[in-house]
Amino acid sequence: LIMAYAHIAHDCIIGDNSIIVNNVALGGHVEIGEYAIVGGLSAIHQFVKIGRHTMISGGSLVRKDVPPFVKAGREPLSFVGINSIGLRRRSFTDEEIGEIQDIYRVLYQRNFNNTQAINKIEIDFKVSKNRDEIIDFVKNSGRGIMRGYNQK
């Protein structure tokens, strides 16, 4: 669903069942995964990738890649939590949601750099499609992923 006055530049890829709310501006070559929601008045920098099942708050400036299954907000854009309500609506099990939550705790809340976090996730979590999707997204991020929330 693409709402009123949204601007979608050249060569963008928007996944199925995604929602682009009013007055969103997408730069060129932006990729948005399935079931993503981009809040109104948000601006997405060129070449940014937004993962599946994400929710980006309105008025956000998205300069970095946003991994799958998360909620993102604040300025600068940062991790707010996982999109648990959206995942439940799409029939993710409690076990899958718990696994995703635990993976993002390692990635964003344990003071590891991305390489250290990915190594720990690969060791500590059994292979699953959601784990592998998160790992692949972070490893293949061209612009780097958004940061974790810092209260400072």
Predicted stretch roles:
Residues 69, 75-152:
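Terminal amphipathic alpha-helical/low-complexity segments used for targeting or macromolecular assembly
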